[in-house]
Amino acid sequence: RISPLAVVLVGGDPGRIEAIRDSRAGVEDEGSQLVALIAAEAPLEGRDERWLDLCAGPGGKAALLAARAAQKGAHLLANEVSPHRAGLVRSALRAVPPDMAHVRCGDGRDLGRDEPGRYDRVLVDAPCTGLGSLRRRPEARWRRQPGDVTVLAELQRELLTSALRAVRRGGVVTYVTCSPHALETSLVVRDVARLLAREGLSTEILHAGDVATRLAPQPPAGADCEMLQLWPHLDGTDAMFCAVLRRTS
């Protein structure tokens, strides 16, 4: 419905499909596919050669990004803080030409300081409460406490701040969570943009809904909003959130 790359199987074991075993295809929610495509296609100014997935594990979005980067002649750095999850990312990228993607194990919060202004595109698929996937994982509600939102929101701010420092002027950062909670979504985006503006790093929020409409066979229900929120009951996806910011100074 909303991912131009999706194939819906009504039954069977996906693991028996050769393309999935070879990592040429993967099992992923359509919402996750769409936000990764938005990250790959959002309009930027200037070169489009260096891409970064700041929180790449377990690798579904990274694989899609890497394939898109290879098609465009760009290179993807897939960063993941967990060694185990970094291994999953390497497995997910097996079908991508090795010179087009590289996996690194490190803390994404450090990249903005260590490599300022290096990247043209950055995806921040931030750790979150996962409240947007309750339709598939209803038991997750019992593993979360109200205080988790506050803790994760601070981490999300740090990661988005790092991403905006790592992207060059004219480049774009796509911020994604699998949560509809405002404390993890729009408030993070606006707070970070406001804080960095005080330090002289300016951004503009691009219209993620317009990018989604251009890509999706059927526009998402919330495509009229500049920050895109998907919904299970309207879009048939997890409740993914997506915002696109372009660095202007």
Spans of model-derived segments:
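S-adenosylmethionine
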Residues: R1-S249
